Design a protein with these regions (language model features):
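Solvent-exposed alpha-helices and their adjacent loops that cap or buttress functional pockets
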Residues: 32, 129-130, 136-139, 156-161, ...
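ATP-binding N-lobe of GHMP and related small-molecule kinases
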Residues: 1-95, 113, 117-122, 157-160, ...
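Short, basic/glycine-rich phosphate-binding loops at helix/coil junctions
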Residues: 46-60, 107, 129, 199-208
């Protein structure tokens, strides 16, 4: 069985409150894009489940990969036999794109289907939430408004069909803990539902990522990418999550693959 975990972008991100437990309450809109990893599970004669990695190099012990944590959740709960897992990484990490969370969520869904587990969609959501606040989003893969610590989801009317999207990630990565330590919570002046209901051409200056000011000050090359995307005709551009990737929406076809040497560049079409 093979499936293709996709990335997401944050169309906006507001830090609205600091919580007593040290976390932050946020408001953000998750939007799925078609930048994808490849994930395969197959039977094995081995005594233990193994994860094989290819593509973008991921540092650290594969046993600590979120995919393996997802596997252990279900294998322990249902006493499952070992499998072999193959993960080809194409989604950059440390980019605010949710690649690791997507891999884990897809693995949960694949294991449920492969072994025909008696697991409802709601139960699968709970298993995903135990792995990461944004993991359940990838089980639904449609635009959602996220609140709380990013784990409370509400449907939102939004369509970006036919827009072109360009994603640029510089070589620098922004640690999430560092990004949060630099921001001050601020309540948005306009409800997000009102803002995203406006034409995309009106989003600039209205949809805000609260991480940008402090992250751009510390990593000016990220801010320069956003400015350049606007100069190249973007209708809307923003950093995704806590960075370091920047995405831009265009109302026409563009080819910017050679415009950002040393950066990861991906171009696609918005499908929802």
């Amino acid at each position: 069985m093979i499936r293709f975990p996709n990335a997401k972008i944050n169309l906006w991100l507001r830090i609205v409150a600091r919580r007593p437990d040290g976390y932050h309450n946020i408001e953000t809109v998750f939007y799925p894009i078609q930048l994808q990893d490849a994930l395969e599970i197959v039977p094995t004669s081995q005594q233990e489940t193994e994860l094989s990695l290819s593509g973008i190099v991921i540092d650290g012990d594969p046993q600590n990969n979120l995919v393996m944590k997802a596997w252990r959740r279900l294998s322990c709960r249902f006493s499952l036999p070992p499998i072999s897992i193959y993960l080809h990484k194409a989604i950059p990490f440390g980019a605010g794109l949710g690649g690791g969370s997507s891999d884990a969520a897809f693995l949960l869904a694949m294991v449920r289907d492969y072994f025909r587990l008696p697991l409802s969609d709601d139960e699968l959501d709970k298993e995903a939430a135990s792995l990461g606040a944004d993991c359940p989003f990838f089980l639904h893969n449609k635009p959602l408004l996220a609140k709380g610590i990013g784990d409370e989801f509400e449907p939102i009317e939004l369509s970006l069909k036919s827009y072109r999207i360009v994603l640029v990630k510089p070589s620098v990565s922004v640690p999430t803990s560092v990004a949060y330590s630099l921001v001050t919570p601020v309540l948005p002046e306009e409800p997000v539902r009102d803002t995203v209901s406006r034409p995309v051409e009106e989003w600039r200056g209205r949809l805000i990522n609260d991480f940008e000011e402090s992250v751009f000050a510390r990593f000016p090359e990220i801010g320069e990418i956003k400015d350049r995307l606007y100069e190249q005709g973007a209708v809307y551009a923003s950093m995704s999550g806590s960075g370091s990737s920047v995405f831009a929406l265009f109302d026409k076809e563009v080819d910017l693959a050679d415009c950002y040497p040393g950066c990861f560049v991906w171009t696609g079409i918005c499908e929802v």
